[in-house]
């Protein structure tokens, strides 16, 4: 991946756990010949100079500023407040928090141990209660203080212990926080809970873990449903699949939770997949836009959902690259997009040419591809 990060910002641009290829450990890969090291250094310096020119406004536009066709707010219509209150754990960039907010829930608090992620939520929702850093460490919280004040607990515990990207050590991984999520639910006893994670956690390898850590302790108090959902089936132009656990308290006199049905058809965008959704044929559902169409880019004759966007919360690289594997890099190239150095704005991206001439993404573009409302 010669110099593909373009010497970009050292801030996060992605928002989720990887599918593969990002659990980096050790420094063995850094032992490279001096000649190649010098070549990388020259590429990096040239990229930084080009970036400086783009950020200063001195560089000319290499393309028009794109105007997205997809408005993600239309995928999650804003609903009236109904009085139910939601507490967020492992909040990250606030995706679940925003979803529950738009669904009419009153935000109680967000807990996120990484300061910069908590700062992101605060910047976008300054009126919310956000606990970051030490305050966001869920292992140190007595959740009984929230009993009677929270109706739903939701969160996505760190996925690295279960992702195919890593060693999949499960409960032996210090980052396994599912027991803390379960502790929170049992101490607060909300009316309902929702947890999500990578599909790897639903694999046979982790069946005993899921049963002993999630289903049995929560099943004492809740009717629990496990199911999977794919983002493109709900109009999001990104290849993202997640497993969910949703529970409704047994004494709540509420109907059993029913997973949502797909709202969009994406058969026309699934030619690269091993299994094809909606394989019964055409449906009456609206079609999910491909990534190019969603971002308002010219029709090249080929479009597809974007590959799973890499989280910059994983691994030691701290770059604005959102590519998570060589296979994903090829898929980005197929749709003419450059994922290795996300620009801070569309204006800057329009002045900062990618090495291969492909469309350089901006933070706002990545938000659209992930379904984040503006």
Please describe what each predicted stretch is.
Residues 40-43, 47-192, 199-212, 216:
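Core alpha/beta nucleotide-donor-binding catalytic domains of modification enzymes
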Residues 141-152, 160-335:
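Class I S-adenosyl-L-methionine
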Residues 2-43, 50-55, 72, 286-374:
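C-terminal target-recognition/interaction regions appended to catalytic cores
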Residues 133, 157, 196, 224, ...:
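Residue-level signal for pocket-adjacent positions within structured domains
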Residues 90, 111, 137, 228-230, ...:
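Residues at the C-termini of beta-strands that transition into short coil/loop
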